[in-house]
Amino acid sequence: MKKNPSRNVHFSKGPSKLLDKINVSIDVDQRLFKEDIAGSIAHAKMLGKQKIITKRDSEKLVSGLRSIQTDIKRNKVKFSRKLEDIHMNIESLLFKKVGKVAEKLHTARSRNDQVVTDLKLWIKNNSIELDKELKIFQKTLINVSKKNVYTIMPGYTHLQVAQPITLAHHLLAYIEMIGRDRSRLKDCLYRLDENPLGSAALAGTSYPIDRLYTTKELGFREPTKNAMDSV
């Protein structure tokens, strides 16, 4: 039986088929491919800028990652369940593109800060898109309300007819509800807008990284202040 290094210390036997099935997340997290690649590109560029790796290796990594992103968008990539998640899949693809240089991408980076960065970017990007859709929905309700200022309908309370109201009054109530939801999204985006990349596995790294650089590259407002809190 081929041993898994991550399990050697505590387990003498391999995992059950059920556990392997549970651990496979590629069916879900493949949607993170753009964010995972964006984080890796920013990190690779920073490693080159800081001379932690050579400029040539940095450029090779960036080129390989961009090529992978293009392949995925063109549906040329079939993700492997054997590689469990999007991170391992992209790393495997990168190794095929650029060879052993791919191993340098994890210099000064852990899977911990990588995953948190991916998730923050994904939620941030999708929250922005969701807010745009909610704004369109509000405008649609307002337009319908303007046409129904004098349209009478029954108003209900406790599942019983209570008062005559207008359709406009009813629809405009949803404008307020959606407005509160958009305010929550705005607050969520503010809290998300901190870059955890560089926190590494737990308490940062001894490499001379530049977190302000990756923060700007990824479009975050600022880097997180405490590595342990970040991951």
Where are these regions (language model features)?
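Short, intrinsically disordered, charge-balanced linker/junction segments flanking boundaries
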Residues: T224-V231
